[in-house]
A protein has these predicted regions:
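Extracytoplasmic/periplasmic substrate-recognition and gating elements
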Residues: 49-50, 55-57, 77, 143-144, ...
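Hinge/lid segment of periplasmic solute-binding proteins
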Residues: 86-135, 142, 284-286
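C-terminal capping/gating helix-and-loop segments adjacent to ligand/active sites or protein-protein/ligand interfaces
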Residues: 299-300, 306, 339-346, 360-417
Length: 417
């Protein structure tokens, strides 16, 4: 009898092990880049078909929505995703108890853009190399006899804006610039994060964080901030006011794609949108030139990182690590990142070049050098959206540059460390 019971127990244990080994694992990806959602959906479907015991789903929250708030809501509902995004130190500090060590992942040795914890542990998978400046329609500039290569100083850009503004009817323009700063329209990040990065990083060496560090200490470079404010006010002045104050991502991009604006304050992530809208004109980037010191530098970095939830089950974590390795190191992953999603890859082994014109402009700028880092992701969670964004929007409403400078200065004093 004892022998029979022993055999039965061992048999049940083996059945349990086999069942556990063959049980399907489901992992969910929660991300914020709405422009790549269709491509990501196709990729996770492909991966799920290629790995029968793993199902990957993807959910996208975009359009300037509160991504951090959405993750908090998921955590409160016991629905914390297995793979999600952080955008820098602010996100890491907030979610560090839910971020796994990815030291054993194959992709780590294939990139210089991994996100590392303060202890030097790789924890973040770089989504891509992204960048921005002031995008331009080369055909419109040529029609106005403006050479974009000469637009390297504030005075040169200002003269070009004035000339184009006087030719709007002739050129079929609604505005010189397509820019948005609406909090309700979800474009708060365009100005309070991306354009404002020119204050933090412009005209400095790539790893020179002195201006940003000074701001985080509660001290602003008053001359630099005043010059930036003049430039920002100029962008606002020459923008379509409806898009500026009430527009959303789609309306901002559509104005540029349709030839209704000569410039746009967006990054290379709009390449797929431009293709979908049928924009075939040549385009490129100039820098955010707010000083008279010549610059061609663009603002380039990894925009965000996938992290794996360390509180997920061991099986889910292992499946998530394998999924990210597949994305980074296989031809299928390279095809998704570059050919389908139009991203500039963050991984050295990926040799496919992006076809999108703005992404190609970034590749050229990277080869040229003299580009600038991103610092807005190091601000505390919610600071860019809920503190800075209303200040940037208010300047578009009342044009009070002194009040803008005072409000920005006070905002950084409130988070001084």
């Amino acid at each position: 009898m004892k022998k029979l019971l022993s055999i039965l127990v061992v048999t049940l244990m083996l059945v349990g092990v086999v069942s556990a080994a063959s049980a399907e694992v489901t992992i969910d990806v929660f991300q914020l880049k709405v422009e790549i959602d269709p491509m990501l959906q196709d990729f996770v479907k492909l991966y799920s078909e290629m790995t029968p015991d793993v199902t990957v789903t993807a959910e996208t929250l975009g359009g300037g929505a509160d991504y951090g708030g959405a993750i908090k809501a998921k955590l409160a509902a016991d629905q914390m995703p297995v793979i999600y995004m952080i955008e820098g130190a602010g996100g890491y500090d907030l979610w560090k108890d839910y971020i796994a060590d990815m030291s054993g992942s194959a992709w780590v040795a294939d990139t210089d853009l991994a996100y590392y914890s303060p202890e030097g542990v790789p924890v973040g998978f770089p989504i891509a190399m992204e960048g921005f400046g002031l995008g331009y329609n080369a055909d419109i500039l040529a029609a106005a006899d403006i050479d974009p290569a000469t637009l390297t100083t504030l005075s040169a850009v200002k003269a070009a804006f004035e000339k184009l503004d006087g030719m709007k009817a002739e050129l079929g323009l609604d505005s010189v610039v397509s820019c948005g700063t609406s909090t309700s329209g979800g474009l708060w990040w365009v100005t309070s994060q991306h354009v404002f990065d020119a204050y933090y990083a412009g005209y400095l060496d790539y790893n020179d964080s002195s201006v940003y560090d000074m701001a985080r200490a509660g001290q602003m470079d008053t001359e630099r901030l005043a010059a930036f404010t003049d430039y920002l006010a100029m962008l606002y002045q020459y923008s379509d006011q409806e898009i500026l104050l009430n527009g959303n991502y789609d309306s901002q991009v559509a104005a540029f794609a349709g030839g209704k604006a000569a410039f746009i304050t967006q990054g290379n992530w709009i390449d797929p949108n431009l293709a979908q809208l049928g924009a075939t004109f040549p385009m490129g980037y100039i820098s955010h030139c707010y000083l008279e010191e010549p610059t061609q530098g663009l603002f380039m970095a990894a925009p965000s990182w996938f992290v794996v939830n360390s509180q997920a089950t061991p099986e889910q974590q292992a499946a998530a690590f394998a999924f990210l390795d597949f994305m980074a190191t296989t031809p299928e992953g390279a095809n998704y990142m570059v050919a389908e999603a139009g991203m500039v890859p963050a991984f050295k082994s990926v040799t496919i070049l992006p076809s999108g014109p703005l992404s190609r402009a970034l590749v050229e700028a990277s080869a040229r050098g003299g580009n600038y880092n991103w610092y807005f992701g190091q601000n505390p969670d919610g600071f860019n959206q809920y503190t800075l964004a209303p200040i940037f929007e208010l300047l578009a409403v009342d044009s009070d540059k002194d009040a803008f400078i005072a409000d920005v200065t006070a905002a950084f004093a409130s988070i001084a460390q």
